[in-house]
Amino acid sequence: MLTLEKIYKASEVLKEVAGKTDILPASKIFCDNHIFLKTENIQSTGSFKVRGAYFKISELTEEEKKRGVIACSAGNHAQGVALAATKHGVKSLICLPEGAPISKIQATKGYGADVCLVKGVYDDAYQKALELKEQYGYTFVHPFDDEDVIAGQGTVALEILEDMPKVDAI
């Protein structure tokens, strides 16, 4: 079960790779509430996804790290896993659908991952990643349905609560 303690642990681990981002008012959104935006787009990979990937890989055993990791993505998670794996000295293979933006594919390769382009859509890339995981013994880094990934991504909420303790909703 995910605990607040684990999210705090992730926050400490992530100081190595994810900077604390600003919260800015969304002045162009007109509604009855005050809306703020967290500028996760300025993270090294352009999104918050590096947080979950980095913490997940940091929690792997040495044996799991030796075997490498695999993930599927349409872009942002791919870059997060690629960078996180490279920083940990872990081999990574990312399955992306052929239609993924070329900029995402190039960035993923640039962060050190091997890329497997899969004919079809995201679901096809997901299935291919699961097949390769079984075939080669990689650890699968799920983009959202994983306790360690959620803990890493949950550090965004800690930062929001630190900067805006009276926030009504996140």
Language model: regions and residue ranges:
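PLP-dependent amino-acid enzyme catalytic core
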Residues: 1-170
